[in-house]
Amino acid sequence: MMNHEHSQGIIELGNINIKCLIFKINSNDILEIQSTSITQSEGIHNGVIVNISKATNAIRSCISAAEKKAKSSLKKINVVLEQPEFLCTKFSKHKKIDGSKIHKDDIEFLLKEAKKQVMLNDEKQSIIHIFNHNYIVDGKTFIEEPIDVYADYLSHEMTFVTMPKNNLKNINKAFIDCDIEVERLISCTFALAAKLLNNNELQFGSILIDMGYEKTSLGLFKNLALVHSITFPVGINHIIKDISNICSLNLEESKIISDKIDFSFQNNKELFDKNDYLKDIYFKNSNYRRISQSLILDIAKARLDEIFEMIQKQIIATGLNPTLGANLFILGGSNLFNLEKYCSNFFGSNVKKLDKNIEKESQGELDTQFASCLGALKIIKDGWETEAIPELVDENSQKLGFFAKFFQNKP
């Protein structure tokens, strides 16, 4: 249960920055964001602690700065992250009802069996999230719990998100060294969807692609549930490094070029001269030589195609097809110009580019910089009706359905 009137914290562990947000909810359920802070990330790569000492110092610095602004001290904190090592597994459990009513005990049995199977399948994994996808009653799909419905057969489809226990131990260790306890972990993909997608988009089917600096994350949502997610350890920086390696340019020059590319590939006159060679102004430190437009654009296309092909395989495997009505969104965190147009051409569907300050009532820089934290705040404050492990979500929340309540305060 959420502690009202006490300051609570959310921290996002990113590759470039660590972000902390401290908030408070009073007895009237009114939210107050007390402070935020951003510090440079160290000792963390793609959500994984790779250097305990550096990560601890960076985390401590970020939390301390936020605590100082909020004039409060945190004992626990919610951690937002995304790792390529996250595993997303879909389970379907079945039970014979034999013409009787479906009771809560029947659903509880299926939930327990699924959770038990996940833990037995890989003892080295820890469960981060469980989502209810849907129920199948005598061949018919039910979105909500089919309590008191007469049936012969009940199936329950669930999605489990897990992470390696050793990764979790290292995260806990870093925060313990900061004298703070991890309250819960929240997938960054889930948090971004909670912040940026509306109820209809989450209900009827959406695909969210978040292209980051060192990784690309994919989340597929339907019936208000995360039905599939995966993170690939390849991102925008790989385009920069490809240009650098193949064209013998330094990384600074390659980044400037990457940022200037029009990914609709219709107009790149800013980069190239009338003979279609890279303009000399982009050779900041390297010696000028002829580098053709086709070479640079082919390098960028090849890396993008590699990323999108991996994503396409995942989408096809789940059956959530953007050409058949599912919404497809790409996050603008990478800031590649006209990336959504190339994405639309690749997937054969209209792709919408999301800005992290998409809401019209945006709080400006707060929404832009802290979209993941604000999404996590929404999940923590209101609960998520299809999520099964919000043990620390306010039990008075109206959005906390039976599926969530079942796991509340259970091991």
Feature annotation, model-predicted:
Residues 16, 263-266, 323-346:
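Glycine-rich phosphate-binding loops at beta-strand->alpha-helix junctions
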Residues 353-401:
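Glycine-rich phosphate-binding/hydrolytic loop that grips phosphoryl groups
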Residues 51-55, 300-307, 369-373:
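Phosphate/oxyanion-binding active-site loops and adjacent basic polyanion-contact surfaces
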Residues 197-270:
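Acidic, glycine-rich loop-and-beta core segments that form the ion-binding/anion-interacting portion
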Residues 32, 212-214, 342-359:
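Acidic-glycine-rich active-site phosphate/pyrophosphate-binding loop
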Residues 306-317:
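A short, acidic, amphipathic alpha-helical segment used as a generic capping/interface helix at domain edges
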Residues 1-17, 21-76, 80-207, 225-227, ...:
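Nucleotide/phosphate-binding catalytic cleft detector across ATP-hydrolyzing
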Residues 46, 195, 241-244, 360-366:
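Short, charged, surface-exposed secondary-structure boundary motifs
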